Amino acid sequence: MRCLYRGALVSVVAIGLAGCGGEPRADVTGKVTYNGKPLAFGSVIMLKAGGPGEPTVAEIQPDGTYTFYGIPVGETRIGVVSSNPNFKLELRGDQKQPPPKADPKLWFPIPSKYSQPTDSGLRCSLSAGPNAHDIDLK
C-alpha cells in the first residue's frame, strides 16, 4: 500500500511540474534605420499588445543593431527613441561626462511620433525562439 501511495504522489508531482514551463519567450534582433541610414544612438522599446506587462528596452548599437532576450511572444508594439549624445548632463563635484558609444557626428533626430510604442504605428508579431525584425523609419 505504501508503494502505491508513493507512486500516486510521484505522478501528481510530475504532472504538476509539467505545467510550470511559464510563458513562451522570444529573442529579437534587428537593425533600426531612418530613411535608409542606421541609427547610431538610442533605444528600441517593445510592449506586448493588448495585455498587461512592462515595456522592455534594448540599446541601439553604433551600427544600428539591437537585441532583446526573453521577451513575451505575440503581437508587439514598438517605439524608438534617438538620444542626442551631444546633450550635456548636469554633473556634481568631480563627476565627468561619460564618453559616447559612437561618434556624436553620426547622430540625427527622428520624428517624435516613434517614441511611444502605443502611438508609433510600429508593430511586429513574435514567436517563441529567435526572431529577426528590422525597423525602417520614414
Language-model features: locations:
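Short amphipathic beta-strand segments in non-cytosolic proteins
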Residues: 42-57
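Structural motif
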Residues: 29-39
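A short, solvent-exposed beta-strand micro-motif common in secreted/extracellular proteins
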Residues: 74-84
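Extracellular beta-sheet/turn segments enriched in Thr/Pro/Gly and aliphatic residues
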Residues: 97-138
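Bacterial signal peptide processing site
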Residues: 20-24
